[in-house]
Amino acid sequence: MLRRKTQAETNRLNHHIIELLFRQTTRFFAIFVFLLLAAVMTSLVFGSWDSFSTFGFSFLWHNDWNPVQESYGAIIPIVGTLITSFLALIIAVPISFGIAIFLTELAPEWLRRPVGTAIEMLAAIPSIIYGMWGLFIFVPLFQEHIQPSLIEWFGDLPVFSYLFSGAPFGIGLFTAGLVLAIMIIPFIAAVMRDVFTIVPAILKESAYGLGSTTWEVMWKVVLPYTKTGVVGGIMLGLGRALGETMAVTFVIGNAFHLPESLFSPSTSIASAIANEFNEASGLQKSALMELGLILFLITTVVLSISRLLIMRIEKKEGRK
């Protein structure tokens, strides 16, 4: 009897120790995330301190990048990053929405799995493959056919004459934005497909029963029900586009001058760092570190805005 009681107390103590160890371990893992973010932020701040102390906040809008004279500014990479990322979103979001509608509402059962698998495979392709594909396929195609046609069609229109003008190099912001769009389509489409499938069938069946078309059901029933998930998927794609390096480096042109049109060669923050960091030293290396810090802050701001937008949508839905 005494031995059985002692054994029970020992088992209870062992369970308590295991539970305590489990709780502390998971707590450490959670804290480790914040420590990792703090470490990245600290290293970027210390690495960019020389550049910040030399140029101050003028680094943000200065458009010169001259290693010989040690004069650096971030506005050109910032503009290139934002233009290519938002251009990619403009192209990718409608296509992703169409793919998600097809997979959830229109595709026959035998076709849904192969198409879904193909989307997942596209998401798994390394970015350097997209970059090589863009350089050897898109660039000649754009240079010889697409860009000359766009210049001919839109060159005389008031607004489009600025967007589609200049020499048809093939490489440039437009090509980089298109390659980025192809890269982020699988991510956005997969998220939209998943959130569309959680809509209760009775809502869609009721709408169809009232005579609604597929477009009306998606626009007035499915999309309002899944707004939060759709916004999250779009922001996931934007975050992917902002930080993309290799694919953009292949096709953007890597030129440090402000773009005159969408066809102009330019550069992005990630491309500038990838091209120059290995050979940089002194103030140039510090300027590249500050570019990295700016990219870190941009992605943080985008993530924060997306979270606030999602919270606002959820709060508004809660009032209904």
Curated annotation (Swiss-Prot):
Pfam families: BPD_transp_1. The chain crosses the membrane at residues 28-50, 81-103, 115-137, 169-191, 230-252, 288-310. It is found in: Cell inner membrane. Keywords: Cell inner membrane, Cell membrane, Membrane, Phosphate transport, Transmembrane, Transmembrane helix, Transport. It is a multi-pass membrane protein. Residues 1-27, 104-114, 192-229, 311-320 are cytoplasmic. Signal peptide: none annotated. GO terms for biological process: phosphate ion transport. Its main location: membrane. Residues 51-80, 138-168, 253-287 are periplasmic. Part of the binding-protein-dependent transport system for phosphate; probably responsible for the translocation of the substrate across the membrane. Belongs to the binding-protein-dependent transport system permease family. CysTW subfamily. This is Phosphate transport system permease protein PstC. The lineage of its organism: Bacteria, Pseudomonadati, Pseudomonadota, Gammaproteobacteria, Pasteurellales. The gene is pstC.
